[in-house]
Design a protein with these regions (language model features):
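N-terminal Rossmann-like NAD(P)+-binding subdomain of aldehyde/semialdehyde dehydrogenases
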Residues: 2-113
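Electropositive phosphate-/nucleotide-binding environments in soluble metabolic enzymes
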Residues: 14, 18, 33, 40, ...
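Amphipathic, non-transmembrane alpha-helical secondary structure
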Residues: 18, 44, 86, 136, ...
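Structural signal for hydrophobic packing residues in well-ordered secondary-structure cores
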Residues: 28, 32, 47-50, 54, ...
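Rossmann-like NAD(P) dinucleotide-binding subdomain of oxidoreductase/dehydrogenase enzymes
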Residues: 105-241, 292
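ALDH superfamily catalytic-core signature
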Residues: 205-305
Length: 305
């Protein structure tokens, strides 16, 4: 997601975005408490969306990155997405059950329970680094809980964003789930909609702006933000094993992962052996260097710099 712009005036809100939101909000008002068979059906359709179109998904993500091996997309996005859906299908009906909770003796013989209820329309802002998984994961949570969901895809993955929009339109009615695409202007307008919950994955700087925009509507926000991820190597830990494991995490997706190791903390006397082993491990993993098709490309020049 790019830097966000000035808040929009009500009349400046993109018509299709506003219409998509209003459609879902009206649908939820008419049917606020969906039953498990309906939720299960939506999850099953989401699973088919991924499994039936896996090869095309891998090709479009490869095109957006300018080179990302299919096996990496499978391991990091396709399989985790299917696992999320299958987990919700296994447990979703149980999650809907009321939960009895303790009541103080001063309130006896009263009884109390927690009753799970849908929120309404859930907004999801998806980043570019794992565009499939970071769209599917939040959608699973929204749909299994009985919500409607509106998803804003990243402008940095235009081919996949267009494909995902087309697939969601194929497998879902617009009042169930919908996708919007566009630049920072659309992202700003999206954040200003009065969602019942908003989920954002991206940078800390943009996360602040998303939360500020949502605050005008008192929209609850879940932020999953980037940061620095240190790795610590204990004095007694084998250097070669440490280098192998750290490089595996760092080089996955060319390091374009929010939890990819950023730096290593280790005893001074282990620095040179670690650097030597890390270089050797990188050569073993990618012997052709940048010419190796198994190494993911950086998504664009801006992020490379």
């Amino acid at each position: 997601m790019t830097d966000m712009v000035e808040p929009m005036k009500p009349n400046d809100m993109p018509t299709d975005l506003q219409s998509a939101f209003e459609l879902q909000r009206a649908a939820f008002a008419q049917q606020p408490h969906s039953q498990w068979p309906e939720r299960r059906d939506r999850l099953q359709r989401l699973r088919r969306l991924v499994s039936d179109n896996e090869e095309e998904i891998e090709r479009t993500i490869d095109a957006d990155f300018g080179g990302r091996p299919a096996i990496e997309t499978q391991i990091a996005e396709v399989y985790p997405s299917l696992a999320e859906i299958n987990g919700a299908l296994r447990s979703g009906e149980r999650w809907m059950r009321p939960e009895r909770v303790w009541v103080s003796k001063w309130f006896l013989p009263a009884r109390a329970e927690i009753q799970p209820r849908p929120l309404g329309v859930v907004g999801v802002i998806v980043p570019w680094n794992y565009p499939l998984y970071l769209a599917i994961g939040p959608m699973v949570g929204a749909l299994v809980a009985g919500n409607r969901t509106l998803v804003k895809m990243s402008e940095y993955t235009p081919a996949f964003s267009a494909l995902f929009k087309r697939l969601v339109e194929k497998y879902f009615a617009p009042e169930e789930a919908a996708v919007v695409t566009g630049d920072a202007t659309v992202a700003q307008a999206f954040s200003e909609l009065p969602f019942d919950h908003l989920l954002f994955t991206g940078s800390t700087a943009v996360g602040r702006r998303v939360m500020a925009a949502a605050a005008a509507n008192l929209t609850p926000v879940t932020l999953e933000l980037g940061g620095k991820s240190p790795t610590v190597v204990a004095p007694e830990y084998p250097v070669q094993r440490a280098a192998t494991r750290i490089l595996a995490g760092k080089l996955l997706n060319a390091g374009q992962t929010c939890v990819a190791p950023d730096y290593v903390l280790l005893p001074r006397e282990m620095i040179k052996p670690f650097v030597r082993e890390a270089r050797a491990q990188a050569r073993r993993m990618f012997p052709a260097g940048l010419g190796n098709r198994d190494f993911c490309a950086v998504v664009n020049q801006r992020h490379y710099q």
